[in-house]
Amino acid sequence: MVVFLSKNVRSLLSIFKKKGQKQDEQRKLTVHYTASQHYQENVFIEGSRPKYLEDLHTEAQEGLKILQQEEEDTSSKERNESLENDSTSGHSIISVSTASAVSTRPVLTRQGSTFKPLNPVKRLDKSKRRSRRTTIMGIPQQVQRELDMARGTMLQQLPNRGHDSEDDSSGTVVLQTIDGDLPSVNHEGARVHLQNIEVLQASRDEDLLLNHIHSVYQDELNRKLGLGACPTQRPKSLAVPGMTTYSFLQEPQGPVMSISPQATYLSKIIPNAVLPAAIDIIEINHDHNRCSASTASKGSMASASPSSSRSGSGTNQAPPTTSPSRSNSQSSETIVSNSSTISSKGKCLPTFDADSAKDISVLIPKDMSVSSSSSWKSSEGKGTNHRLNPREYGDAGDNVRNSHSFSRSLSVMKTKLPPAPPQRTYSLHHENMQRQREQGDIQDPKDVAPNNNEQTNRDISSTKENHQSAKNKKSSVHSLELRSDFHTTVKSSPLSPDQVFTGRHARSGNSSPQKTRECGENFDRTLSPSSGYSSQSGTPTHSPKEVSPSSPGKRRVKPSKPERVCAKTSPVVSVSSSLTSLSSVISDTAHQDIQTNTTSSEPLKFSPPLTTVKNKVTPTHQTIALRTLFNIPPPPKVKAPSPPPPETWVQNKQTLELLCGPGPNIHKLESLISKTQNKNSMQINEQVIPKTQTTEETKTENTVVKELTKSASPQVHKQMMVEPPDVRHTEKSILHNELKSPETLAKVNQIPHTQDEKTIEDQKDRWSQTLPTTNVPSIIVDQSMLSQTNSIEKTKAATVSSNENQRNCIVTDIVNRISVQTLNIEVPEVNGVSPPPSPPPEHHPPPPPIKKMSDMSVSIPPSEKEEQKQVEQVTFPESSWPPPPPPMEESTELMFEEQDELDFPPPPPSFIHEPMSEISDDFHEESCEEVSIKLLSTNVSDMDSSPEQDSERHTILPKRIVQNSVEVRQQDKSSDSVSEFLEDQAEIENTNVASTIISSHLPDKNLHEKETLVSTSIPLAPPLPVEEQSTINFRKQLSFVDKDNRSKELLCRHKSTPIPKEDANIPLVTPSLLQMVRLRSVNVGEDQVNNDSKPSTEPTTNEDHSISSQVTPQKPIRRSLTLKSNSPAKSSSASSAVPSMCLQEAIRMKTAAMSCSGVPAMLNLRSSSGSSATSPVPSPKSPDGCDLLMSPASTASFIFSKSTKRVVIETPTSPDVQASLKQSLAAEIMQVSDQAKTMITNGTKKPIKVPPPVAKKPVHGSNPPNKMENATQDKTEILTNKQIMRVDVNGQSDQVHPAGQRAQSLGNQEQASKEAFAMNMSICA
């Protein structure tokens, strides 16, 4: 294996390629270096390598040495010559030097050696590349040359004036690299320590550049000013002979800069070069002495001179003529500022006397930069702007024009927008830069203030001071500071130039604004060094223009050039764009500050006033700019972004809590508490539980609860808000556990229910007041309230431990009696509660607690369930908050689903999308929550109403709970029967509307009136209490199916019909449908009333009658209202009608299991749970009758249902069919009512087997119950939301018949449903 070490691989290749040696050597190589050798010879060991290898190696070594030497020579020459001729012939010289170095180097010519001497041309190319590599890292050579030449020439002149020639070389400008390497103190021209470039630029190059710049500036200024002062030979472009054009061609850097991308965007050719604070390259030192040149960090250059270092040349502080235009080009203000002492710093500069230079140095240590020095030089030669010499005018005009031309050329060169990172980088520097700017501005005011009267002298002295201070201070003002100063300077300097041009400082305030506008606009372009990248407005463009108007009168500052609009707009946007953008941002900030300050200091437009303005602007920039930049806008008061669609986060309790977070605001709790108190006061009157006993406890408890709520709620809310969903779930679990714990029960008992009600209602009032405003917090508030109430109840429960035991026993008994109902009800409540969270946060707060409660209720023992009921009741009063009434059905569905789908709540369309339905759902859920809260409060007040007797309370509590459940059942069973079928109808037809209406009415009326009843059942706000009780159990069992089905159904409804759920449920509310619904409502109401009143309680029948009477005419909305008003009763009746619900649930479960049709099963389940199992089946039909069948939502529901059966949707062809369908529905409702009555008569939660309902509907194809039962076993025809879905258990086919045709099949289907119901009841029995 041959190891050939040589930089020139070709020499190695040539070894083998030589004709004569090729074969022999190849053979030798093959022989000597076969892989078979036991060892590979080390070619570098002399003894082990053959002679040809030795020769080759020697050749390679020698060639390498030669190459190294040549490279060294080339690099040294390149440095020297490139820096000498850096502006123009640096690269060409480098190339020549490389060639010369190559040629001067002895060329190896070894006989038979494969090494070939370096090709001088190639070497030249390599040296060029190397040169490029060396120069790329620093400020672009153009910029360096410009800075060096401008500054060097200026400084040379200045040293002649004896002001900044501390360096041995008068024109020495020390450009430091970020590396911090400083050129030797004595350097001619800019010394950039980038890599190897540490050579002095020839003064001739600087002179050339300066002459070019002066001519450009003068010509530009003349054009701007309309002065003919040096109109002769104006460079057509900024291209400086050796620097821009030649360098551009030869320098890879190009005229802009090959620095950091930011630097590239922020820098321009000398006059326009703006070195942003973010530039990595160098810090421009005013001083010739390197001592004052502090290593320029990215912001150092800018700090060195705000505007001039920004411009990268002495733009800010440039002499009146050169500096103004240069400043203008570099930083919008510089041009003007140079003409009229750039801002406070540059102001002195225009009078480029030794004194003024000194003053400027003092005043403009930051503003001054190398380019500013160049400007000084030019202005020095030209005279001070303040002196208003004709030459000054010409110079100022030339400067302005030159700056404009430069800015144009630079802008042309810099067409790109600065990268966003610079903005961040710059933004990071904002504070420091602003501080430095403050310091610099403060310094400037000191220096500039004196200049007010002695501006010319001060300008000279300022220039000197500027250089000196640039040397000494070199105050590293970040480009922001520089720009703020720069902008200030621009503002003032345009005035100053006007003053200079006008010769009137006073008038320059007025004319200067206009002129400043011209200059500002122009120099805004000139500012394009950075602005050129951000559409020339850059920072300088935007801020200078604004700044200069600011100094005349901020009025113009705001109206930036439309061209600059992007830059002005970019002040914020540009920030990210680059330092240019940053400058624009800063300039905007400074502009604003300047506007604020300059407005007051407009009279200061004169150079001295400008100084004052600058001083003012500096504090303003610091204060306002820093405030503007660093004052992070307060986080939005909104607790959280609008919650994602309910399906996303409603499903997740944690997410719900997180999104809806318990309102950390105590005020919300207080408002809710006050509201709860108000509602409780109403409820107290309405509640069956004696509240006389609870008065004292209520007061005490209200105080305690309020205190706890106030003290704990904020924390709890904050915790809920801050804590992740898991923590909230944990809190909920703790809450539930606490509620479950006998202590909690005892506490709840102990807590006067009235008191709790009042407290909770007060909280609800407060919360409701707050919640509507902040929905998400309200949920958290509910949770926190629940947790607080639970804690309070716990505390009180601890006091009544013995009572807890008794009460636990009683509660256990009561729960055993009501456990199914409570559980079912709780589940709906939970679902109802949790769904709202998924909607807008307003209604969310209540749901999460209920979810917890419902989850707990599902898993908690009866006593715990009862407590949970109470908690849920408390939560429902919270729901009672005045959120927009959520649609009942969605609440119901969501409740159902929420228990089952707590993890993944049904995807109800977000309330925003379906405001009516979702709001209704939310409101309904909130209503349910309110009801549950009120009921809980009632229960608590009932339990605690007799604080004297905790055991009595326990006894009373169970009794009351039982009574409440019975009363609620009695009151609501009628409403339940009716409301169940209404719920089905409402769910089907107007689930959303019904939910909305019901929830709206229910929270206000029924929550108060039937709070106690609802507390027992904790009915879902939607009219699905009974329905959902059974459905809840069923859904718990079929939770996944129901969840999926319901979510699918909801999704289908929402998707298929973007209309509110009510619309989706009731796509078409036809008269026939309404009639069917009414008939069903009447039949079901009567039947259910009969059934409910017979088995359970007569009050239920009465309520059912009232409900059915209400339901009969009920339109979807009215039904919602009725359901709303009766939903507590419904839930109570659901609790009391648990047996029927159980039967219904069993039927539904069996039907769902048999049908496994996702949406149809869910619909049936919902309907049946609402309407005693059979009623719900028809109710989907009648309410939705044709509509659901016809509605795309229903169709989508069927299509998307999980059932594998085919769904054949048949639309009723004729009103006759629809009428027959209505009749069949009525008959079916009657049958279902009979079944429900039978179940209720059994009065056991466990549904007693009811003989299969006899199908007596006038529906053709009706089968006897047995047949239907059998058919149900084989086929379960499920009417879902206005559609009859024949679910083939075998998965063969499901026929969905719209109202018309469905009427015919309704008999069979309803009979089948009834038979299925009977079968389920028998199964349950």
Swiss-Prot record:
Biased composition, class Pro residues, residue ranges: 834-850
Ranges annotated as biased composition (Polar residues): 335-344, 400-412, 450-460, 935-948, 1088-1100, 1302-1311
Keyword Coiled coil: yes
Keywords for this protein: Coiled coil
GO biological process, one term: cell differentiation
Bias kind Basic and acidic residues: ranges: 428-447, 515-524
Keyword set includes Cell membrane: no
Reported function: Able to directly activate the TNF-NFkappaB signaling pathway.
UniProt-recorded name of the protein: NHS-like protein 3
The organism of origin for this protein: Danio rerio
